[in-house]
C-alpha cells in the first residue's frame, strides 16, 4: 500500500520538492505519495510546486480567526479546524516541511486519537537551538568559538517545541570560512536528504 503524505508548508517549499521528487524518481517511489499540501500563507511558493505536480492544495490562514474571535480563542479555533482538515484527509503521515506555526495540543491530541503521526524538520541538532532562527543562532555561536558543528534533524512532533524524539539527525560542520549564506545552504542540503530518509524509515518500520 502506498503511504499518503499531507505536507504542511509556509514558504518556498524546497523540502516539499525534495519529497515530491523522491516519490516520483527516488527512494519513496512506489511507497509514498504526497496527497495534499496545506499552507498557512497564501503567497507560499510551495503551493505552486504542488500545483505543478498535480497535488491538491488548501490554505489555512490564522488572521481571519484572530479578527473574528480575538488572538487567544481565535488560535484555539484555528488549530482545532486544522486538525479537522487533516483528519478528513486521512493521511498515513503528516510532514511539517517549513511550517511556521507551533502545533498546539488542539492539533496534536486529535491527530494522536486518530493514530496520525506528525513529523517536523528542524535545522539544528537535538536540544541545541530549539525554536526560531536556529541557523542564525548556531552561526553566531560558531563565530564566538562556542561550537564547530550544527546540523538538522527530523523528529516526532510533541507539544514542546522541537523536543520530540529524533528520527534522523545529520551533523553539519561550521567552517571558519563559512558565511551565514554558505551555512544555510549546507543545512538545507542536509534537510532535503534526511527528510526523505525519515519518511522512508517510518514507512519501512510500519510495514
Swiss-Prot record:
<feature type="binding site">
    <location>
        <begin position="100"/>
        <end position="103"/>
    </location>
    <ligand>
        <name>(6R)-10-formyltetrahydrofolate</name>
    </ligand>
</feature>
<feature type="binding site">
    <location>
        <position position="162"/>
    </location>
    <ligand>
        <name>(6R)-10-formyltetrahydrofolate</name>
    </ligand>
</feature>
<comment type="pathway">
    <text>Purine metabolism; IMP biosynthesis via de novo pathway; N(2)-formyl-N(1)-(5-phospho-D-ribosyl)glycinamide from N(1)-(5-phospho-D-ribosyl)glycinamide (10-formyl THF route): step 1/1.</text>
</comment>
<comment type="similarity">
    <text>Belongs to the GART family.</text>
</comment>
<dbReference type="Pfam" id="PF00551">
    <property type="entry name" value="Formyl_trans_N"/>
</dbReference>
<dbReference type="GO" id="GO:0046084">
    <property type="term" value="P:adenine biosynthetic process"/>
</dbReference>
<protein>
    <recommendedName>
        <fullName>Phosphoribosylglycinamide formyltransferase</fullName>
        <ecNumber>2.1.2.2</ecNumber>
    </recommendedName>
</protein>
<feature type="binding site">
    <location>
        <begin position="13"/>
        <end position="15"/>
    </location>
    <ligand>
        <name>N(1)-(5-phospho-beta-D-ribosyl)glycinamide</name>
    </ligand>
</feature>
<feature type="binding site">
    <location>
        <position position="191"/>
    </location>
    <ligand>
        <name>N(1)-(5-phospho-beta-D-ribosyl)glycinamide</name>
    </ligand>
</feature>
<dbReference type="InterPro" id="IPR004607">
    <property type="entry name" value="GART"/>
</dbReference>
<keyword id="KW-0658">Purine biosynthesis</keyword>
<dbReference type="GO" id="GO:0006189">
    <property type="term" value="P:'de novo' IMP biosynthetic process"/>
</dbReference>
<feature type="site" description="Raises pKa of active site His">
    <location>
        <position position="162"/>
    </location>
</feature>
<keyword id="KW-0808">Transferase</keyword>
<dbReference type="InterPro" id="IPR001555">
    <property type="entry name" value="GART_AS"/>
</dbReference>
<feature type="binding site">
    <location>
        <position position="120"/>
    </location>
    <ligand>
        <name>(6R)-10-formyltetrahydrofolate</name>
    </ligand>
</feature>
<feature type="active site" description="Proton donor">
    <location>
        <position position="122"/>
    </location>
</feature>
<dbReference type="GO" id="GO:0005737">
    <property type="term" value="C:cytoplasm"/>
</dbReference>
<dbReference type="GO" id="GO:0004644">
    <property type="term" value="F:phosphoribosylglycinamide formyltransferase activity"/>
</dbReference>
<dbReference type="InterPro" id="IPR036477">
    <property type="entry name" value="Formyl_transf_N_sf"/>
</dbReference>
<dbReference type="InterPro" id="IPR002376">
    <property type="entry name" value="Formyl_transf_N"/>
</dbReference>
<dbReference type="GO" id="GO:0005634">
    <property type="term" value="C:nucleus"/>
</dbReference>
